[in-house]
Swiss-Prot record:
The gene is clpX. This is ATP-dependent Clp protease ATP-binding subunit ClpX. PROSITE patterns: CLPX_ZB. GO terms for cellular component: HslUV protease complex. It comes from Agathobacter rectalis (strain ATCC 33656 / DSM 3377 / JCM 17463 / KCTC 5835 / VPI 0990) (Eubacterium rectale). InterPro entries: AAA+_ATPase (IPR003593), ATP-dep_Clp_protease_ClpX (IPR050052), ATPase_AAA_core (IPR003959), Clp_ATPase_C (IPR019489), Clp_protease_ATP-bd_su_ClpX (IPR004487), ClpX_bact (IPR046425), P-loop_NTPase (IPR027417), Znf_CppX_C4 (IPR010603). The lineage of its organism: Bacteria, Bacillati, Bacillota, Clostridia, Lachnospirales.
């Protein structure tokens, strides 16, 4: 502001002239601000809890890097079995974040090693990834590969999976750039055919091609509200170089490809003859090679960007029983706590736990199906207990489980509900 028709330079905020203040600082379009107004602004910011002089800590400072042994020990508290998978994951995650924290100080460029997890439904793929992110203290997001399509077609762009990570980091881009993304159902975006086709495969090979850049590391532009990009939209830039991608899938049928290759390669006098029935899915996955994934429908460029392969075993009856009882947040412990909050004790007999595990095996849903079974078993009790203050303890046995898993199942038998003694 030039002044009030007197030719003097004044502060654009308080109107004082250059003679009345210690200093005037010029800005764009002929604007000025004096030192007194600057002090007032600083006081306002300080009162609102904004300190412009405070050094912001780097997002790297939040990363809790622990040794592979410590990582596996933490996984053991929450995930039952899968020891070899835990070791491989612990080493891979440790090396990834060691590389992130080292930055560009090394003469040797350390390449990112994304992870491919193979295992049947309910074997613990998602839980392993979630638990790793929690102990490392980085943002974590889950994406479903089946919703993705190539840019320009109906469905989600691959950049939308980055938006989920940004949201998990509360829009702190620096934190998001050190996060973990788990892409589930990755086996569902395979090529529809090994042969070259003239028709466009927008949800298969097209998605794999679109994922290549962000898996490897690139400066991506993400729509802040999701959906498709458009020219008038402000985009969020994010560097994916230090984001760890863990891709998981059941890969149904891959074991047949592996078996076929191994049977062919084992022909000869000195071959180790082994029938296909002796090689279960978990064992077959341990022998998976890049050419097996290519035959399954993943493109070679995609396989090259997920160099670490982790195979998970299908959970057997003993593992399911341990999952129900042993982890820190096991389902039985969770339901026991819920009942405690209502002042009621809860007990499961061994036969009841065995029956729940058997039902999960029958449904072939692995650990994921245990909660649905438990909900069906506990529903009537959880409905009744908050209103009935006379109940002091509930005992769940095999008959209780079987009765409540029937479509016409009635309430838990009265004999297994202990009532409080009359006062």
């Amino acid at each position: 502001m030039a002044g009030k028709n007197d030719g003097k330079i004044r502060c654009s905020f308080c109107g004082k002239t250059q003679d009345q203040v210690n200093r005037l600082i010029s800005g764009p379009n002929g604007a000025f601000i004096c030192d007194e107004c600057i002090d007032i602004c600083a006081e306002i910011l300080e009162e609102e809890g904004v300190d412009g002089h405070e050094d912001k800590s780097s997002a790297k400072d939040d990363i809790n890097l622990v040794t592979p042994e410590e990582l596996k020990a933490f996984l053991d508290d929450y995930v039952i079995g899968q020891d070899q998978a835990k070791k491989v994951l612990s080493v891979a995650v440790y090396n990834h974040y060691k590389r992130v924290l080292a930055g560009d100080t090394s003469d040797v460029e350390l390449q990112k090693s994304n992870i491919l997890m193979l295992g049947p439904t309910g074997s613990g793929k998602t839980l392993l990834a979630q638990t790793l992110a929690r102990v490392i203290n980085v943002p974590f997001a889950i994406a479903d590969a089946t919703t993705l399509t190539e840019a320009g077609y109906v469905g989600e762009d691959v950049e939308n999976i980055l938006l989920k990570l940004i949201q998990a980091a509360d829009y702190d881009i620096e934190r998001a750039e050190h996060g973990i993304i788990y892409i589930d159902e990755i086996d569902k975006i395979t090529k529809k055919s090994e042969n070259v086709s003239i028709t466009r495969d927008v949800s298969g090979e097209g998605v794999q091609q679109a994922l290549l850049k962000i898996l490897e590391g690139t400066e991506a532009s993400v729509p802040p509200q999701g959906g498709r990009k458009h020219p008038q939209q402000e985009l969020i830039p994010i560097d994916t170089t230090n984001i760890l991608f863990i891709c998981g899938g059941a890969f149904d049928g891959l074991e047949k490809i592996i078996d076929s290759r191994m049977d062919t390669s084992s022909i000869g006098f000195n071959s180790d003859v082994k029938s296909k029935t002796e090689l279960n899915v978990g064992e077959a996955f341990k022998h998976a090679l890049p050419q097996d994934f290519v035959k399954f429908g993943l493109i070679p460029e995609f396989i090259g960007r997920v160099p670490i392969t982790v195979s998970l075993e299908a959970l057997d009856r003993d593992a399911l029983i341990r999952i129900l009882k042993e982890p820190k947040n096991s389902l039985i412990k969770q339901y026991t706590k819920l009942f405690e909050l209502d002042g009621v004790g809860l007990e499961f007999t061994d036969d009841a736990v065995n029956a729940i595990a058997d039902k999960a095996l029958e449904r072939k849903t692995g650990a994921r199906g245990l909660r649905a079974i438990m909900e069906a078993v506990m529903l009537d009790l959880m409905y009744r207990i908050p209103s009935d203050k006379s109940i002091s303890k509930c005992v769940i046995d095999k008959d209780t489980v079987e009765e409540n898993l029937k479509l016409d199942g009635d309430c838990v038998p009265e004999a297994y509900i202990e009532e409080k003694a009359a006062s």
